């Protein structure tokens, strides 16, 4: 996989979804930072990295609940800078409010929008999607280039439509999938035919943010290019 996953579960699981990758410039790029991510990254050799980026998809607690802790750990223990990347100015404002309430000084981290990282070889675009009505126009996925691979990461989404223009042949798709719930997430049964059609174009489909990992694995067991993400 292009991404390494620290968690793959939904909001009520014990392993909230988060992933990361490393760059040739000794950067660690983390996608979302729930509390689980803060716990798990401490077991990685973080000293080898010179800088951390955290890409935020949206501000639900199971996606940014550990962000403030990670900022403090990077600053006070690792002595390394953290850049938090928000997909929009509105989301950046919400992140600032949340981190300030938690007692984080804005001087401890850099908070930018995606316009500040367009020069990064691994970044292409953020993708507005539909998820929670309470966060209308504040939920995003990302289009990334990792090790020369076209990567589409949906974040939490109830639709595939915004991501279709980015899914070129041979891409890797990491997609929010629910076995039972659906509604504000893609339901696996409803999306499976779309996933199968993607694989016919050489697209690798990885399922994440799952409410039932075992059930999802059984449902896609017969499809070689559709699978549940594995944990790092």
Named regions from a protein language model:
Residues 36-85:
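Active-site metal-binding motif and surrounding structural segment of the metallo-beta-lactamase
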Residues 65-74, 97, 215-220:
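Metal-dependent catalytic neighborhoods of phosphoester/phosphodiester hydrolases
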């Amino acid at each position: 996989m292009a991404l390494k996953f620290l968690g793959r579960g939904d909001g009520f699981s014990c392993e909230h979804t988060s992933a990361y990758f490393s760059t040739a410039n000794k950067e660690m790029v983390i996608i979302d930072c729930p509390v689980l991510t803060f716990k798990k990254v401490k077991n990685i050799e973080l000293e080898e990295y010179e800088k951390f980026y955290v890409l935020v998809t949206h501000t639900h607690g199971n996606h940014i609940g550990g962000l403030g802790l990670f900022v403090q750990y990077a600053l006070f223990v690792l002595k390394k800078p953290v850049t938090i990347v928000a997909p929009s100015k509105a989301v950046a404002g919400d992140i600032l409010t949340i981190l300030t309430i938690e007692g984080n000084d804005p001087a401890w981290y850099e908070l930018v929008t995606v316009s500040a990282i367009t020069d990064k070889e691994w970044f292409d675009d953020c993708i507005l999607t539909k998820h929670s009505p309470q966060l209308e126009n504040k939920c995003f996925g990302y289009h990334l280039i990792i090790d020369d691979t076209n990567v589409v990461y949906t974040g939490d989404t109830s639709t595939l439509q915004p991501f279709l223009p980015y899914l070129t042949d041979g891409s890797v798709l990491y997609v929010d999938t629910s076995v039972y719930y659906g509604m504000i997430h893609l339901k696996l049964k409803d999306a499976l035919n779309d996933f199968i059609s993607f694989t016919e174009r050489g697209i690798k489909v990885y399922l994440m943010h799952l409410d039932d990992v075992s059930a999802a694995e059984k449902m896609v067991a017969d499809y070689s290019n559709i699978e549940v993400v594995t944990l790092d």
